[in-house]
Amino acid sequence: MISDIRKDAEVRMDKCVEAFKTQISKIRTGRASPSLLDGIVVEYYGTPTPLRQLASVTVEDSRTLKINVFDRSMSPAVEKAIMASDLGLNPNSAGSDIRVPLPPLTEERRKDLTKIVRGEAEQARVAVRNVRRDANDKVKALLKDKEISEDDDRRSQDDVQKLTDAAIKKIEAALADKEAELMQF
């Protein structure tokens, strides 16, 4: 019983950490990354389709992404979708390829992005703490029903706290990496 609760808490905390890492990977840092365009959806014959399914996105150099659209007739729609996104990017068409130069970030924009990343980190920490609370509540219910001893309850709470500390440490490490990446020129 307790081991199931612990495993469930561990899995849910890992999901919180991964969701945070995925969320901050979408935040532009001034360095080209194909994941920057992951959230872009293109209208493909009347159906909203993720860009990844319509084209390959590669890094041409540190400030340029290269998009190779599989169906050339979709190039204008892909360009339009990138311009319509809130990323502030202006794609250039060059034959079958689309190049997306990434403008350098201003100091003010870097600070704004840092605040956004810190907010995301706080939400991730809160999610991890909620998982801890849920796990501890389940253990308390077992204690109340006399299914486990007080020693087991205390041991379980300590285990869950260690999991929480580890998950928050991972979040802090990812936050520090992203902040350092944002502040590089």
Swiss-Prot record:
Enumerate the GO terms in the molecular function aspect.
Answer: ribosomal large subunit binding
Q: Write the record's keywords in alphabetical order, separated by commas.
A: Acetylation, Cytoplasm, Protein biosynthesis
| Presence of keyword Transferase | no
Question: Subcellular localization, per the record?
Answer: Cytoplasm
Q: Name one GO biological process term.
A: cytoplasmic translational termination
Q: Which residues carry this modification: N6-acetyllysine?
A: 162
GO cellular-component term (any): cytoplasm
The reply on keyword Acetylation is yes
What is the predominant subcellular site recorded for this chain? cytoplasm
The family database entries (InterPro entries) matched by this protein are listed as: Ribosome_recyc_fac (IPR002661), Ribosome_recyc_fac_dom (IPR023584), RRF_sf (IPR036191)
Q: Which HAMAP family match?
A: RRF (MF_00040)
PANTHER family with a match to the protein in the record? MITOCHONDRIAL RIBOSOME RECYCLING FACTOR PSEUDO 1 (PTHR20982:SF3), RIBOSOME RECYCLING FACTOR (PTHR20982)
Similarity field:
Belongs to the RRF family.
The function of this protein is:
Responsible for the release of ribosomes from messenger RNA at the termination of protein biosynthesis. May increase the efficiency of translation by recycling ribosomes from one round of translation to another.
This protein is called what?
Ribosome-recycling factor
Origin organism is Escherichia coli (strain K12)
